[in-house]
Amino acid sequence: MGRDIYKDETLTIPEGVSVDIKARLVTVKGPRGVLKQNLRRVDIELKKQGNTIKFIVWHGSRKHNACIRTAYSIINNMIIGVTQGFRYKMRLVYAHFPININLTENGTVVEIRNFLGERITRVIKCLPGVTVSISSAVKDEIIIEGNSLENVSQSAANIKQICNVRNKDIRKFLDGIYVSERGNIEELE
């Protein structure tokens, strides 16, 4: 396998968003807030030139070149997060025992009761910057919102994972909380 001498990718920064890069510590500021990400573990060169960011790899192998697109996607998701935000919608699915959900601490802690008729209360603490609300338009739906895609999606995964059915046939017992829709809070025209 050969090595590429030089490989780069360019990301354009939209209006109203400022990006600051210091020693691969990226800070993105926008109308919805501020996000920070440490990219020191990714061995690439980041340069901010005007309203663009350039990702550069010198003498990179195939895996090293793949880091360009990873860093590109991370920063692009941060830009989308501070301009539009991220929203996950999850549906409560049950056959017999209705699942009860309570939100505490301003929608940052989710309590799940009566899952498969069990007496225990399952408690999930959401990651920082993530809020959970119960949908008023659709029955048995919760909405998870935040600016960081990583935190919103990980909080949704934690809620889904705590409701795994164990020691039963999962083809028959479909009860749980599942992601039904993913998108942005503010859609751009």
UniProtKB/Swiss-Prot annotation:
Its main location: cytoplasm. Pfam families: Ribosomal_L6. It is found in: Cytoplasm; Nucleus; Nucleus, Nucleolus. The keyword Ribonucleoprotein applies. GO terms for biological process: cytoplasmic translation. Keywords: Cytoplasm, Nucleus, Ribonucleoprotein, Ribosomal protein. The keyword tRNA processing does not apply. GO terms for molecular function: rRNA binding; structural constituent of ribosome. GO terms for cellular component: cytosol; cytosolic large ribosomal subunit; nucleolus; nucleus. Component of the ribosome, a large ribonucleoprotein complex responsible for the synthesis of proteins in the cell. The small ribosomal subunit (SSU) binds messenger RNAs (mRNAs) and translates the encoded message by selecting cognate aminoacyl-transfer RNA (tRNA) molecules. The large subunit (LSU) contains the ribosomal catalytic site termed the peptidyl transferase center (PTC), which catalyzes the formation of peptide bonds, thereby polymerizing the amino acids delivered by tRNAs into a polypeptide chain. Component of the large ribosomal subunit (LSU). Mature yeast ribosomes consist of a small (40S) and a large (60S) subunit. The 40S small subunit contains 1 molecule of ribosomal RNA (18S rRNA) and at least 33 different proteins. The large 60S subunit contains 3 rRNA molecules (25S, 5.8S and 5S rRNA) and at least 46 different proteins. Belongs to the universal ribosomal protein uL6 family. There are 2 genes for uL6 in S.pombe. This is Large ribosomal subunit protein uL6B. It comes from Schizosaccharomyces pombe (strain 972 / ATCC 24843).
